[in-house]
């Protein structure tokens, strides 16, 4: 949006280069590597009117459930926790008279470096169904962490590879890297069967009592790949975040209803505001990070989130 009463949407899902006051201090320029350039000029005349017209075009977020506006508590990146640890966190909040609405299990509810195969670690959580029942009896909603990757260490990795559910290189070999976990591969959500497999795992967790999902990652999608449906790898780099969050959102909408559906999402692209809510990325518990989060929230709000 500009101070002259209009907004601009560059309608390209691939990388877009913006020059903001660099070549000419009074101008913003944008470009894409393509044979054409498509963009929309959205009239105002006020910022509110621009945003209203933009969301008519790209979609509007559903109103999140009332409980999602309460306080969330997370294990964060605690690497060694069990039900007793979880209860110590929750009881500590009660002792301090801090009302709690949601408890979130981050990545180590699953076995380390098998992310994401949706199986509770039986050594630390031998009775996940019972634990969830006990936590919900305290009036809590339950959120669990997921991502769109699968570690080579997972027992289901070979099955997923053989069925073609994972992203491939142009030569047909499996695309992998080691930057998050050894031998990481990416679910190919352009494959309908891969989507069904992933969605069924989520539905199993919902049936267990899970209320929402932290859809972590979804960015840094490689471009030296071959998608199941033949999609352009350059365009999928950003669009992947949309189809990933859409898949998880639809599972919740179909199981608990749109009025109760909510995500705890990290990545996004144009239109992903339809799948609320998003968080501003990892931050520290200090005043500097609080300021960063406030600035991020203001920016996201003006981007329709």
Predicted feature descriptions by range:
Residues 2-305:
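Catalytic-domain carbohydrate-binding cleft regions of carbohydrate-active enzymes
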């Amino acid at each position: 949006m500009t101070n002259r009463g209009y907004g601009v949407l560059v309608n390209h899902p691939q990388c877009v280069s913006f020059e903001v006051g660099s070549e000419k201090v009074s101008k913003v320029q944008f470009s894409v590597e393509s044979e054409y350039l498509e963009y929309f000029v959205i009239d105002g005349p006020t910022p509110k009117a621009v945003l209203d017209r933009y969301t008519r075009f790209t979609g509007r977020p559903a109103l999140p459930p009332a409980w999602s506006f309460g306080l969330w508590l997370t294990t964060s990146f605690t690497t060694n926790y069990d039900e007793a640890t979880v209860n110590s966190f929750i009881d500590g909040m009660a002792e301090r008279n801090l009302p709690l609405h949601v408890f979130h299990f981050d990545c180590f509810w699953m076995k380390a470096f098998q992310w994401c195969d949706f199986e509770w670690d039986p050594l630390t959580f031998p009775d996940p169904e019972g634990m969830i029942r006990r936590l919900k009896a305290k009036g809590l909603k339950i959120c669990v962490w997921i991502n769109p990757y699968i570690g080579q260490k997972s027992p289901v990795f070979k099955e997923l590879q053989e069925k073609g559910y994972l992203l491939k290189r142009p030569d047909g070999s499996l695309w992998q890297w080691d930057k998050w976990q050894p031998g990481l591969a990416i679910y190919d959500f352009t494959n309908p069967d891969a989507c069904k497999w992933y969605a069924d795992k989520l539905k199993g967790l919902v049936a267990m009592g899970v209320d929402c999902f932290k859809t972590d990652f979804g960015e840094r999608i490689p471009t030296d790949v071959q998608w199941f449906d033949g999609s352009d790898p350059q365009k999928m780099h950003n669009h992947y975040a949309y189809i990933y969050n859409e898949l998880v959102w639809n599972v919740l909408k179909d199981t608990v209803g749109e009025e109760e559906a909510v995500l705890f999402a990290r990545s996004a692209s144009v239109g992903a505001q339809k799948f609320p809510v998003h968080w501003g990325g990892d931050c520290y518990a200090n005043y500097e990070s609080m300021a960063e989060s406030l600035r991020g929230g203001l920016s996201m709000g003006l981007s329709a989130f």
